[in-house]
Amino acid sequence: MADGGEDIQPLVCDNGTGMVKAGFAGDDAPRAVFPSIVVGRPRHTGVMVGMGQKDAYVGDEAQSKRGILTLKYPIEHGIVSNWDDMEKISHHTFYNELRVAPEEHPVLLTEAPLNPKANREKMTQIMFETFNVPAMYVLSRLRSCLSLYASGRTTGIVLDSGDGVSHTVPIYEGYALPHAILRLDLAGRDLTDGLMKILTERGYMFTTTATGMSYMKEKLAYVALVMSKSWRLPRARLLVEKNYELPDGQVITIGAVRGSGCPEVLFQPSMIGMESAGIHETTYNSIMKCDVDIRKDLYGNIVLSGGSTMFPGSCYASMSKEITALAPSSMKIKVVAPPERKYSVWIGGSILASLSTFQQMWISKGEYDESGPSIVHRKCF
């Protein structure tokens, strides 16, 4: 790393659709985890008089003021759609959460596979020109490799499902196979929206945002809800009643399904009117795009990653069952659900950025000044 300074701890930032995970290379877990759906501005002029009004609020502070702020979502389906707001999130990450001067630390960023090239260049430009970082690197296809490495494997297929997007990434002997990577715009936020829609059909009125719904979804860990005929329960067993208090004080009683754990929508997108393959079919289709000689290794190493695979009882059992039904009968199916998978991408990045062998991989400030933002395509994978 030409300009990075090897004695300085690199920063690792995993900017997801729903949450930002940030911290220092070499650490076991991120120091900061906060919502990335969170840049807020006053809805009405004058409503925050005397509250020390700012132009924008980020993270938990914006969320706490959601009743009087207009929340904005700078990342949609894993891709940055509002760069001004994304810049504010990065500023908040460095100065408020990690409390560091970014010009003193190399920065490792992650991005969704199949991210548009223009977005990669824009993020590179912001890091070097706005935050003056000494060096940086952007993980794309290699991002999913980290989840695989964290499980002790170098060959397998990673199903990464977060808040905004899901991906299947086949990896053989440490290398992602780009022709077989598939993207599915179905993830945690769709489950949240589905929950909100069904509760609205039941007659509940909300003053809270989808953020509150998201917390309820995670807390109750529903498989499916017995509130709408459009929501089928193919694997439902014991019904239980649970109460949940929304941030606005409203108490909702939900008939949740105990037994499975992973929301059925991920396997049956048609439940929310989406014409798409489920995560099991997407995983299968991704494997089928690979050479026939390596499919056995992929079927035997299906690794789950991301927050939307964390529901108790979880995608593990459902994925095993569904893939077994799709695959040849002679094929041995093994699904792996590492306990740390919610942060496996960040943890992998932390390990990678602290390796001595990685130091030559950084894009230095000098290289950026010489080649411009397009250098990210030559050096980052």
Curated annotation (Swiss-Prot):
It is found in: Cytoplasm, Cytoskeleton. InterPro entries: Actin, Actin/actin-like_CS, Actin_CS, ATPase_NBD. Keywords: ATP-binding, Cytoplasm, Cytoskeleton, Hydrolase, Nucleotide-binding. It catalyses: ATP + H2O = ADP + phosphate + H(+). It is an enzyme of class 3 (hydrolase). The keyword Ribonucleoprotein does not apply. SMART domains: ACTIN (SM00268). Its EC number is 3.6.4.-. One of its GO terms (molecular function) is ATP binding. PROSITE patterns: ACTINS_1 (PS00406), ACTINS_2 (PS00432), ACTINS_ACT_LIKE (PS01132). One of its GO terms (cellular component) is cytoplasm. This is Actin-2. It comes from Daucus carota (Wild carrot).
